[in-house]
């Protein structure tokens, strides 16, 4: 199973968009406190639209609480622009295994000491950093979870769907 973990998220729109992606992909969302917004924030709810009840959300009091919760197994990946390994070069194909994709705060990322401790688990999305400091958090979460799902052959997701008012028929 795939998991997206957000360390101290600051921007409610990002968290809401990521929640919507989690609902669409059967991905568990882990939210690590403290947040830069109120969970009841109307903008957060609007960004997630009416999918909040479809998202499996796990709340953690801090980073150590999150780490304790995954200590029993699974693979942790820290997503950072400072990583050496490209996310698409990693094997996520085992869909029986828990894959935890941990994203840092939008403004400061993950704690530096923590990243050094988990250096081998760090992955990055390639980009031209001459023009841009970073990519949008919700876009990054979406790219990485869909790469994992692609390698897992999109098991559990609809590959073909017929809509009552299909605009292509």
Swiss-Prot record:
InterPro entries: Alpha/beta_knot_MTases, SpoU_MeTrfase, TrmL, tRNA_m1G_MTases_N. One of its GO terms (cellular component) is cytoplasm. Keywords: Cytoplasm, Methyltransferase, S-adenosyl-L-methionine, Transferase, tRNA processing. It is found in: Cytoplasm. HAMAP family: tRNA_methyltr_TrmL. Could methylate the ribose at the nucleotide 34 wobble position in tRNA. Belongs to the class IV-like SAM-binding methyltransferase superfamily. RNA methyltransferase TrmH family. TrmL subfamily. This is Putative tRNA (cytidine(34)-2'-O)-methyltransferase. The lineage of its organism: Bacteria, Bacillati, Bacillota, Bacilli, Lactobacillales.
């Amino acid at each position: 199973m795939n998991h997206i973990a957000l360390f101290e998220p600051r921007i409610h729109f990002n968290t809401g968009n990521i929640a919507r992606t989690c609902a669409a992909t059967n991905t568990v969302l882990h939210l690590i406190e403290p947040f830069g917004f109120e969970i009841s924030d109307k903008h957060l709810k609007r960004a997630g639209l009416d999918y909040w009840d479809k998202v499996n959300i796990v709340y953690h009091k801090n980073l150590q609480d999150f780490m304790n919760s995954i200590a029993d197994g699974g693979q942790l990946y820290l997503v950072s622009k400072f990583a050496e390994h490209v996310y698409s070069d990693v094997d996520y194909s085992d869909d029986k295994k828990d894959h935890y994709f941990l994203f840092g705060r939008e403004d400061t990322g993950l704690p530096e000491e923590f990243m050094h401790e988990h250096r081998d688990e760090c992955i990055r999305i390639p980009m031209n950093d001459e023009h841009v400091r970073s990519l949008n958090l919700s876009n990054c979460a979406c790219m990485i979870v869909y790469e994992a799902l692609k390698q897992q052959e999109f098991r559990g997701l609809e590959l073909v769907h017929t809509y009552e008012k299909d605009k292509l028929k």
